[in-house]
């Protein structure tokens, strides 16, 4: 069996070179029908029943199941071994249809242009999905840097990188200045000034005016002496 296979692929190349696949072209629809082998493999129910009869018959009485095959495959019909390949006729629907796109076959008659879709580079070119996108967190600085952005055209990526770096620096400086001013506020805080402002903000009532007058009229406390002098408290003038 292996000798016949070797003879099929090596010895009988000249005989099989004359037979080539048939191509049926239809220029109108640009479809190409390729019929290399008109048959397909398969076993019918009747052939399964006849397998025992075929094995008992003589080798020369095999049916010509390879009649539809090329000459390169006819050597497999040698009856020294049992028949292991059987082919049936294939319907037309099981043939191969090879149709190239119209842009390759219609020449200049077609209006279809083969080009890359702009949606392919969406993740790279879209600014909203860029990693280096800077959100405007400094509205005051954006107005100040608007004039400088108009002078530099964002045509080259190097200029865009410089502009983004400048915006980062301006935002960092503004945040640092705000932080320092916030830290300096407690140093300038004075309790007396806060009390004065708080008292001025309060509404003037009868009791508040009376208390203010008492704080002004009362005498300061005398300094306690360390000697033997005993200081007696003065009588209370007001009961409250």
Curated annotation (Swiss-Prot):
GO molecular function: antioxidant activity
Motif LIR: where in chain: 25-37
Stretches of the chain forming a coiled coil according to its record: none
Tissue: Ubiquitously expressed.
Alphabetized UniProt keyword annotations: Activator, Antioxidant, Apoptosis, Autophagy, Cytoplasm, Cytoplasmic vesicle, Nucleus, Transcription, Transcription regulation, Tumor suppressor
Top-level taxon of origin: Eukaryota
Record Pfam families: DOR
Subunit structure and binding partners: Interacts with p53/TP53 and HIPK2. Interacts with PRKCG, GABARAP, GABARAPL1, GABARAPL2, MAP1LC3A, MAP1LC3B and MAP1LC3C.
Function, in words: Antiproliferative and proapoptotic protein involved in cell stress response which acts as a dual regulator of transcription and autophagy. Acts as a positive regulator of autophagy. In response to cellular stress or activation of autophagy, relocates to autophagosomes where it interacts with autophagosome-associated proteins GABARAP, GABARAPL1/L2, MAP1LC3A/B/C and regulates autophagy. Acts as an antioxidant and plays a major role in p53/TP53-driven oxidative stress response.
Domain comment as written in the entry: The LC3 interacting region (LIR) motif mediates interaction with GABARAP, GABARAPL1, GABARAPL2, MAP1LC3A, MAP1LC3B and MAP1LC3C.
Protein name: Tumor protein p53-inducible nuclear protein 1
Gene: TP53INP1
């Amino acid at each position: 069996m292996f000798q016949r296979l070797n003879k099929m692929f090596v010895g009988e190349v000249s005989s099989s070179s004359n037979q080539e696949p048939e191509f049926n072209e239809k220029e109108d629809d640009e479809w190409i029908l390729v019929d290399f082998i008109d048959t397909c493999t398969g076993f019918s129910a009747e052939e399964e029943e006849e397998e025992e009869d075929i094995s008992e018959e003589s080798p020369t009485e095999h049916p010509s199941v390879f009649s539809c095959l090329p000459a390169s495959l006819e050597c497999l019909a040698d009856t020294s071994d049992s028949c292991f390949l059987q082919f049936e006729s294939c319907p037309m629907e099981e043939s191969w249809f090879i149709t190239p796109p119209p842009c390759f076959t219609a020449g200049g008659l077609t209006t279809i242009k083969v080009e890359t879709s702009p949606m392919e580079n969406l993740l790279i070119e879209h600014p909203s999905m860029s990693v280096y996108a800077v959100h405007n967190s400094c509205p005051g600085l954006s107005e100040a840097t608007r004039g400088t952005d108009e002078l530099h055209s964002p045509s080259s990526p190097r200029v865009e990188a410089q502009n983004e770096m400048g915006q980062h620096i301006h935002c960092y400086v503004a945040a640092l200045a705000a932080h320092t001013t916030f830290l300096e506020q407690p140093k300038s805080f004075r309790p007396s000034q806060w009390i004065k402002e708080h008292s001025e903000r309060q509404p003037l009532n009868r009791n508040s005016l009376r208390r203010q007058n008492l704080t002004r009229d009362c005498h300061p406390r005398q300094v306690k002496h360390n000697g033997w002098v005993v200081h007696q408290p003065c009588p209370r003038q007001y009961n409250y």
